[in-house]
A protein has these predicted regions:
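Long, contiguous binding/interaction regions
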Residues: 12-58, 62-98
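Residue-level detector of alpha-helical hydrophobic segments embedded in or interacting with membranes
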Residues: 1-2, 28
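Short, Lys/Arg-enriched N-terminal segments with co-localized hydrophobic residues
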Residues: 3-15
Length: 98
C-alpha cells in the first residue's frame, strides 16, 4: 500500500500528490506486429490457449496539482501531446491520491 503524504503548500496553494497509471495501446484497426510475434512465439513453445495479443505501454507518473480535476487535465495534456501517438494509439488512465 502506498504511503499517504499530506498536501503541501507552494506559493500559497495547497498541492496534492497523485499517482497516474496510464495505459497506451495500439488502436484495434492497426496491425500489432509485436503482439503477432508474441503469439507466434507462444505457439512455437507449444503454449496453447491464447487468442489475440496486443502489446502496449504502462506508465506510472507522480503528479502534483491543486485538485484531482487539475491533475486529470495535466495527464490528458501529457497523453495527447507526448505519451500517445493518437493516430495509432489510444490511452486510458487512473489517478490515485498519494
Amino acid at each position: 500500500m502506498l504511503k499517504q503524504n499530506p498536501p503541501y503548500r507552494e506559493w500559497g496553494l495547497i498541492l496534492m500528490k497523485f499517482l497516474a497509471s496510464i495505459d497506451v495501446m495500439p488502436i484495434k484497426e492497426i496491425l500489432d506486429p509485436q503482439g503477432k510475434a508474441v503469439l507466434l512465439g507462444l505457439k512455437n513453445l507449444d503454449i496453447q490457449g491464447f487468442g489475440d495479443c496486443r502489446i502496449g505501454k504502462h506508465i506510472n507518473m507522480e503528479i502534483e496539482a491543486a485538485d484531482k480535476a487539475t491533475a486529470e487535465s495535466i495527464v490528458e495534456d501529457a497523453c495527447k501531446k507526448l505519451l500517445a501517438n493518437l493516430i495509432m494509439e489510444e490511452y486510458t488512465f487512473e489517478l490515485t491520491a498519494i
